[in-house]
C-alpha cells in the first residue's frame, strides 16, 4: 500500500493560526469540516477564494485541501486560511509536481499580494505605564 502524497502548511495572522493539509484527491476544499463555500462572514468569502481564483480551479481538480483554523477573530482567521491554502498549494507543487509550476504559482501569488505566502509580522505594542494603552497617555492638568 503506497502512501497518499500530502503536505502540511500553516498560515498566521495576529493570533489566528490555520493549518492546511493538502493531498491528492478529487478537488474537495474544507474549512473546519465544512465546504469553503460556507465560510463566514460572507463579505470576506472572496478573500478565501483568492488563491483559487488566481491560479485557476484546474490546479485544484486533483487535490483535496482540509484547513483547521483556531484563535483570533473572523478577519484574522480568513487571512490565515487564505495564506495556508496558498502556501499548501506551492508546497504540494514543489514536492510532487515540478519546480517550474511551483515558481509560476509563487510568482502569481506574490505579484498579487505578498501576504499570501509571507506572514504579516506586525504584533501589538505592549502597554506602558502612565496611560491606558501603548501610546495613549492619561490627561494632564496644569491647574
UniProtKB/Swiss-Prot annotation:
Sorted UniProt keywords: Ribonucleoprotein, Ribosomal protein
Similarity comment: Belongs to the universal ribosomal protein uS9 family.
Protein name: Small ribosomal subunit protein uS9
Organism: Eremothecium gossypii (strain ATCC 10895 / CBS 109.51 / FGSC 9923 / NRRL Y-1056) (Yeast)
One cellular component term from this protein's GO annotations in UniProt: cytosolic small ribosomal subunit
GO biological process: maturation of SSU-rRNA from tricistronic rRNA transcript (SSU-rRNA, 5.8S rRNA, LSU-rRNA); translation
Entry annotated with the keyword Ribonucleoprotein: yes
Compositionally biased intervals (Basic residues): 134-143
A GO molecular-function descriptor: structural constituent of ribosome
Region (Disordered): 123-143
